[in-house]
A protein has these predicted regions:
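A short, histidine- and acid-enriched strand-loop-helix "catalytic/donor-clamping" loop
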Residues: 95, 109-125, 136-139
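A charged, aromatic-enriched C-terminal amphipathic alpha-helix characteristic of glycosyltransferases
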Residues: 316-341
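Donor nucleotide-sugar binding/catalytic pocket of nucleotide-sugar-dependent glycosyltransferases
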Residues: 135-175, 180
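Aromatic "clamp/platform" in nucleotide-sugar-dependent glycosyltransferases that forms part
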Residues: 258
């Protein structure tokens, strides 16, 4: 019998890393809805090649092209033959998750909540629908404090466990060097509207002495390139194994999102020793302490972010980098794993 039957969207690298660690302590079986997605930052974002646990992939292809009814039938077959103590679904956004919530016993049903109070409606019809889903859930594994705020707003009465993360990043070895401020800022992620990159481009257009490098692809890329000055560099998608080199080339990481359920790239930036400027709408903003390892800003306030950027110098950067270096990512990951035990 499995301790957990986990059902999640795709085999993203950070989920594979988390499940591999869980599999050292627990017996788990993972159902991946699809093998890949068209919405990702790099070509090697998802793969089951490194999986060290039992799993099944329902659809071999992009998540957006999957056959939902066929997936539900496959889930029905798996549930009839696999014995488990708990079943953990990774959201309430898919028909597959709703099928599981209403066909499995409530006492076994768990939810991994990666939505925050900022991007998920809790009032009106949408809030009512979420409450119906939660009525079938006994335990919620909430990523952080903004996720717990959403549960409170939805009046969830079940058990809540806080994971302080959504997965485990890759941790390649690298040589740490002391940085001198060179005015180089970095963004890594999808180039879509909710990431608020037009806001960032307009700021750096007005600050030609600073450089912004944007890594990723998305529907806004062509438009943003057309309005960007020469101090804004678009690099396209870069494989995960080369991400460390990009952090090394830059001084500060920026995540300006209007909506960001977590923001795993913030953990990557801290791991590689970069301070982080982060929107207060991001779930992982709780990892950043103002003036210690970065700064938190309002993603609609250009003047405030411009002031933060202009204030950077060698001394401020080195102090922030020193604190970013001292961030214990392994301790955070150990705590995340322990929540499931």
């Amino acid at each position: 019998m499995y301790d957990y039957l986990i059902v999640t969207h795709i085999p993203a690298f950070y989920k594979i890393n988390l499940y591999n660690e869980l599999a050292k302590r627990l017996k788990i079986f993972v159902i991946f809805i699809s093998s890949d997605t068209s919405q990702k930052r790099s070509n090697n974002f998802s793969s089951v090649n490194d999986a060290l646990f039992d799993y099944e992939v329902l659809y071999k292809g992009d998540f957006q092209k999957r056959k939902i009814f066929k997936n539900i039938l496959a889930i029905q077959t798996i549930l009839s033959r696999v014995k488990f103590k708990k079943i953990l679904v990774s959201g309430w956004d898919l028909p597959e998750f709703w099928y599981i919530a209403f066909t499995s016993k409530k006492s076994k049903n768990c939810l991994a909540l990666e939505s925050t109070i900022f991007e998920s409606s809790y009032k009106g019809l949408k809030g009512f629908i979420k409450k119906i889903f939660l009525s079938r859930i006994s335990t919620v594994f909430a990523s952080g404090s903004l996720h717990c705020d959403l549960l409170k707003a939805l009046n969830f009465q079940g058990e809540v466990k806080v994971t302080n993360g959504v997965g485990i990043i890759n941790k390649p070895e690298f040589i740490k060097t002391q940085k001198k401020f060179s005015g180089r800022f970095l963004y890594i992620g999808r180039i879509v509207d909710i990431k608020n990159l037009k806001f960032l481009v307009e700021i750096f257009n007005a600050m030609p002495n600073f450089t912004l490098t944007i890594i990723g692809v998305g529907e806004q890329q062509e438009f943003l390139q057309s309005i960007s000055n020469k101090n804004i560099i678009f690099r396209g998608a870069i494989e995960n194994k080369f991400i460390g080199a990009e952090f090394a080339k830059n001084d500060v990481f920026i995540l300006p999102s209007l909506i960001e359920p977590w923001g795993l790239v913030v953990e990557e930036a801290l791991y590689f020793g970069l301070p982080v400027l982060i929107s207060d709408r991001c779930g992982s903003s709780e990892l950043i302490k103002n003036g210690i390892n970065g700064f938190i800003f309002d993603p609609t306030d250009k003047n405030r972010l411009m002031q933060i950027i202009r204030n950077f110098d060698d001394e401020i950067l080195q102090n922030l980098c020193s604190n970013a270096d001292s961030y214990d990512i392994n301790a955070k990951d150990t705590q995340q794993i322990s929540v499931y035990l």
